[in-house]
Regions:
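Zn2+-dependent metallopeptidase catalytic core
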Residues: 7-23
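Active-site recognition of the HExxH zinc-binding catalytic motif
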Residues: 82-95
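A short acidic/basic microdomain associated with nuclease active sites
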Residues: 25-33
Length: 143
């Protein structure tokens, strides 16, 4: 599979939509990079316009997981919205008191173990934040 690329304008529409709801978040909280990730020590959210094969395979699992765990269907072409919201969820829910334990749990996981990854408390909290945001702002999936 070749890498797919998203339009950063589209990504920032999602970011701006959330900033409009949560003014304590701002564009300076975001940076462009090679993946979707939250840096808790810096309180920075990295967004990416690249969907590679690994992320694509992970999104297939994620689609099933979100439906089974939260009764929410998000199509593959909208999964980037969930990814952004998940990282923003970390911004609002990550407990630095759990940072060392969080890092330990990540180190113990294999790359293919999506189910266990989603069960890590800090990841689950970010998922729940993203799900609640989507359920309360359904039109975000139209971006």
């Amino acid at each position: 599979m070749e890498n797919k690329y998203l339009d950063y304008k589209r990504l920032y529409k999602v970011v701006d939509y959330v900033i409009n709801k949560y003014p304590e978040l701002n564009r300076e909280s975001f940076e462009e990079g090679s993946m979707f990730i939250y840096y808790p020590e810096e309180r920075k959210i990295q967004i990416s316009n690249v969907i590679d094969e690994i992320e694509f395979e992970g999104n297939k699992f994620l689609e099933k997981y979100l439906y089974e765990e939260f009764d929410l269907y998000i199509p593959q072409d909208k999964m980037f919205i969930f990814s952004i919201l998940h990282e923003i969820g970390h911004y609002f829910t990550f407990d630095m008191n759990n940072f060392d334990e969080y890092c330990r749990m990540l180190r113990e996981l294999s790359d293919e173990n999506y189910t266990e990854y989603r069960k890590i408390p800090e990841e689950y909290k970010a998922d729940k934040w993203a799900i609640e945001f989507i359920k309360n702002n359904k039109n975000i999936l139209s971006i």
